[in-house]
Amino acid sequence: MKLLSSLALAALAAQVSGAAISHKLDGFTLREHADASKRELLQKYVTWDKHSIFINGERLMMFSGEVHPYRLPVASLYIDVFEKIKALGFNCVSFYVDWALLEGKPGHYTAEGIFDLQPFFDAAKEAGIYLLARPGPYINAEVSGGGFPGWLQRVNGTLRTSIGDYLKSTDNYASHIAKTIAKAQITNGGPIILYQPENEYSGACCGYEDFPDGSYMQYIEDHARDAGIVVPFISNDAYAGGHNAPGTGKGAVDIYGHDGYPLGFDCANPSVWPDGNLPTNYHTLHEEQSPTTPFSVVEFQGGAFDPWGGVGFAKCAHLLNHEFERVFYKNDFSFGVTFFNLYMIFGGTNWGNLGHPGGYTSYDYGSAISESRNVTREKYSELKLLGNFAKVSPGYVVANPGNLTTSKYTKTADLTVTPLLGESSSAGSFFVIRHSNYNSQASVKYQLTLPTSAGELTIPQLGGELTLSGRDSKIHVTDYDVAGSNILYSTAEVFTWKKFDNGKVLILYGGPGEHHEFAVTGASASSVIEGSSSGITSKKIGDALVVAWDVSSKRRIIKIGDLKVFLLDRNSAYNYWVPHLPTKGKAPGYVSKKAIDSSIIVKAGYLVRSAFLSGKDLHIQADFNATTPIEIIGAPSSAKNLVINGKKTKTNVDDNGIWSASVSYSTPEIHLPSLKDLKWQSIDTLPEVKNSYDDSAWTSADQPHTLNTAHELQTPTTLFSSDYGYHTGTLLYRGHFVANGKESIFFIQTQGGSAYGHSVWVNETYVGSWEGSGSNDNYNATYTLPSLATGKKYAITVVIDNMGLDVNWVIGQEGMKNPRGIIRYNLAGHDASAISWKLTGNLGGEDYRDTVRGPLNEGGLYAERQGFHQPKPSTKNWDSSSPFTGLTKPGIRFYSASFDLDLPSGYDIPLYFNFGNSTAPPDAYRVQLFVNGYQYGKYVNNVGPQTSFPVPEGILNYHGTNWIALSLWAQQESGAKLNSFELINTTPVLTSLDKVKSVDQPKYKSRKGAY
């Protein structure tokens, strides 16, 4: 561990005075001041002041996006996501760790294979991305239990408090995960620069009054420090509440941060921006709550979740689109945010039952990078404009935010301007303009009156007016430094600038139909060296050359001394990329002034991942979804050849030194199997309803008391599944009784989370189902029973679809302890105690059998308990029948088939399994989709909305055999079948991505003790 020397440690201990906190670290005792704002640093790499974070002594704007490694279980695809984030101009990624996946059994921590975090850390380092680690223990994250393993339902104590045994239950996980993270800190050459203890520790209810509990937070922080965490602690208050900010005493973090989801989650109305939802007081609150730390928004809305029965993530992407980014993100910039993390930048998939019941399999989130990892959403391109601007604008980081005004800088109250002023008139200032009614769709003409080093100027100076279109916002700059050239002002926005061997380049852009103006101090003349001069005028005013221009879809370049100004429309700017050009090797390295200065500008299409120089060859690694013209702006003088994705490419060089080339794209031939024509084999996966079924191997539900402290029993023995170690997937119950002839009805209340369902049989007679809805997490059902023979033994079989455990966002509410299973029941003519119950879930419960795919992937269906969802199941005694034929009565059937793929190499080809439904109203049935043993889809036909399930390469074998399996659960008298089920692809992307490695896919083998 590259920590402090023993001498430095001793000196540090001697320096700290007052009430102190002790940590054991590498054999030394460290004592920290209880007040985080007065602590000495434990390392020298990551520091901060009121403006920003410093890394290795260099002040940085941290632009970050949220990625969850557990939602993409293919390690060789991590680099793809990181490179796409790096290409945005970002320099950081935040990630959660899901405790429930790593300690499925109390005391048994395992983080191997797809759950190993080291490949994630390695990919971040390779891409040059810093990391913020957020291991909880509580994470929320729309995962089952908010990241809590199901066995916490049995913990005697209040979750997320010091009450009872909760904190003790976190010890094993907390120490293991913190040690893993500690090894990957920047102090050890790793990418991790910040650590967040707990998550959104921001509110309590239900009689819990000791909030916020500094001792509770301190316990979590101590665990991290004791395990070797030396990077700064940062928080993410759910709102700007000041909880655990520096100076608040025990449990205070080093850097205070908060979240913001101001537009909400109404994806059903994607064009509606409600009045009053734009934050206006973030800076004021920051100055009140944590003025000595950089303003940090640790989660800001990058998309939205969508519930069962929702409208789908396409509409969420529309709600939180490029217009949202322009208005809301620039508004955050107006407050001087310098740690800015977007939740999510890539959402991924809730595979293997890892999601909470409020969401379905997809966790696309409407984010900039889609679930299938494509970057075709306009919001990705818009974000690239802002990310690259932030990267080349060091003056922004130290500018001082002022108060918003509708009169000081413009003459119309329809517009609001918030200034970020430099320390002096020549230090560079930024002015964020938006509609006063932020949701206005009107187009407003305006002029600006701005302070500059040349005095106060009214702009445009050469006539005309500026325009702010509806749902738009701009950042105007004054005294903006471009490698020694002073841009006195620019009304057009800056994308990037660079100083090259042959001069400087500045790229400005504007919206369609806009008029803009910029001025360059000390310049006297300009010339248009590319494109038409129509719509461009210039004039020397005072010591500056003023240039006015009308936005055009055709690029113009103006030369002013050694400065070339590229004038673009916004859509054209989307095609520009600014990859770092490392001075040695291929890896781009982390962001630094040196890395920024050595970058080149590439005009391309779909994606530019990276660039590097090898001898006289300039290499560009890029992806293409169409034939694309390429331009290199600022190629090093030592470069003589252009190599794109390993192929030397013919180039032309124009009079301005711009290299041009072209990459041809042709759609490859892709042959996908017809799933309807596969050789399907099937088996009844509900043998439990047969009179001959023997459930003697099942768990007896005979505990007279529940260990769940949040819910009282309403049954003679507990039927809460987690009391018996079953926390995931389908649950089955069998209740045995002797009939007395009075059994006219059966009442049952079950609980399984949103969109869950249940079905009930008495012996082999189907009596009914709750088909599910997006709004019910439990249901009371009363069923009429057939006449039963007095004195005969009967079994009631209840199948319950567990949709995941609830999150525990509000302390004291104990949402995670909401049980799954049977809550209460009544059989007419019998006392409740007359029924003796057995239950099962996944085979082994917490002693789960498939340690490769983890503790949540399997549920309790017979086929799952046997392992038939894995590749090459034993189908000797199965039937030859297809899910397209399905069932003719209520029940559950399991289907398995295989197919081969041999897809073209060199392409990233997104594949989807699509379910179709042509009936109205929709038939009531449920399907689980397993791909090579991984549950990669949970489809509820009558609830929705998800019908298309992307499965990444690595789970699917693109060059080999694949096994798919389906469980088809019919919840209606007529049975169910699949009307349509297809494997489809979207546009193949010609890619420079390295070959994707398939994850471990253990094949079926007979399971000892399976029943």
UniProtKB/Swiss-Prot annotation:
* Short name of any one Pfam family annotated for the protein: BetaGal_dom3
Q: Where is the active site?
A: 200 (proton donor), 299 (nucleophile)
Residues annotated as glycosylated are: 156, 374, 403, 625, 763, 780, 917
Reactions listed under catalytic activity: Hydrolysis of terminal non-reducing beta-D-galactose residues in beta-D-galactosides
Protein name as it appears in the record: Probable beta-galactosidase A
> What EC number is given for this enzyme?
3.2.1.23
Q: What does this protein do?
A: Cleaves beta-linked terminal galactosyl residues from gangliosides, glycoproteins, and glycosaminoglycans.
Q: Where does substrate bind?
A: 96, 140-142, 199, 261, 365
Family membership noted in the UniProt record:
Belongs to the glycosyl hydrolase 35 family.
Principal localization reads secreted
First and last residue of the signal peptide: 1-18
Identify the species of origin.
Penicillium expansum (Blue mold rot fungus)
Q: SUPFAM superfamilies attached here?
A: (Trans)glycosidases (SSF51445), Beta-galactosidase LacA, domain 3 (SSF117100), Galactose-binding domain-like (SSF49785), Glycosyl hydrolase domain (SSF51011)
A GO cellular component annotation here is: extracellular region
